[in-house]
């Protein structure tokens, strides 16, 4: 499905919240959307690895990495696993790496920046809790839509207007 966030904002002004303009598109999909799954971790992508190995059909993984710019929470190998398991995309409040490969992967990826160093792997983090960044709170089970215009969230699923 192709989403256009300005059209969704116009059609559903009472439902959508717009994430502050701080994320950039790194994935092979320019637009993506789905039900939110949340994860909170700081400079440790162990739980990201676990989640992308699960079925992600119709889902978007929202990763609150604390805004760290000191390591990447997603690279080409995990992105490939996410695409293989049907994830629509990932939104990362942190960094990614292997950006040339990410751009060729059939996956939506929005993140703060690229950084070549990988994260630690200590198994530290939390799943399925509300996470807040970019001026909005992402809640598990709600919906996220993203394109090159930005990222929006809604408590219920949205359909593109005719």
Swiss-Prot record:
Cofactor note: Divalent metal cation.
EC number per UniProt: 4.1.3.17, 4.1.1.112
Binding site for substrate: 75-78, 97
Keywords tagged on the record: Lyase, Metal-binding
Gene Ontology BP annotations: regulation of RNA metabolic process
Top-rank taxon, per record: Bacteria
The keyword Protein transport appears for this protein: no
Cofactors (names): a divalent metal cation
Gene3D superfamilies hit by this protein: Ribonuclease E inhibitor RraA/RraA-like (3.50.30.40)
Tagged with keyword Lyase: yes
UniProt catalytic activity: 4-hydroxy-4-methyl-2-oxoglutarate = 2 pyruvate; oxaloacetate + H(+) = pyruvate + CO2
GO MF annotations, alphabetized: 4-hydroxy-4-methyl-2-oxoglutarate aldolase activity; metal ion binding; oxaloacetate decarboxylase activity; ribonuclease inhibitor activity
Residue ranges that the Swiss-Prot or TrEMBL entry lists as coiled coil: none
Residues annotated as binding a divalent metal cation: 98
Function: Catalyzes the aldol cleavage of 4-hydroxy-4-methyl-2-oxoglutarate (HMG) into 2 molecules of pyruvate. Also contains a secondary oxaloacetate (OAA) decarboxylase activity due to the common pyruvate enolate transition state formed following C-C bond cleavage in the retro-aldol and decarboxylation reactions.
Annotated PANTHER family: 4-HYDROXY-4-METHYL-2-OXOGLUTARATE ALDOLASE 3-RELATED, REGULATOR OF RIBONUCLEASE ACTIVITY A
Family: Belongs to the class II aldolase/RraA-like family.
Subunit structure: Homotrimer.
Name of the protein this chain belongs to: Putative 4-hydroxy-4-methyl-2-oxoglutarate aldolase
Provenance organism: Pseudomonas syringae pv. tomato (strain ATCC BAA-871 / DC3000)
């Amino acid at each position: 499905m192709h989403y256009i966030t300005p059209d969704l904002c116009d059609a559903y002004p009472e439902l959508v919240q717009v994430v502050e303009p701080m994320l950039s598109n790194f994935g092979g999909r320019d637009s993506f959307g789905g039900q939110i799954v949340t994860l909170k971790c700081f400079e440790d992508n162990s739980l990201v690895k676990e989640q992308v190995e699960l079925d992600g059909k119709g889902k978007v993984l929202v990763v609150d990495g604390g805004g760290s710019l000191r390591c990447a929470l997603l690279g080409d190998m995990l992105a490939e696993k996410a695409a293989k398991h049907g994830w629509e995309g990932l939104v990362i409040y942190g960094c990614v790496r292997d950006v040339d490969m990410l751009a060729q992967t059939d996956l939506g990826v929005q993140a703060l920046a690229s950084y070549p160093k990988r994260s630690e792997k200590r198994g530290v983090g939390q799943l399925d809790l509300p996470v807040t960044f970019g001026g909005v709170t992402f809640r598990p089970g709600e919906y996220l839509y993203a394109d090159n215009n930005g990222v929006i969230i809604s408590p219920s699923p949205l359909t593109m207007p005719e």
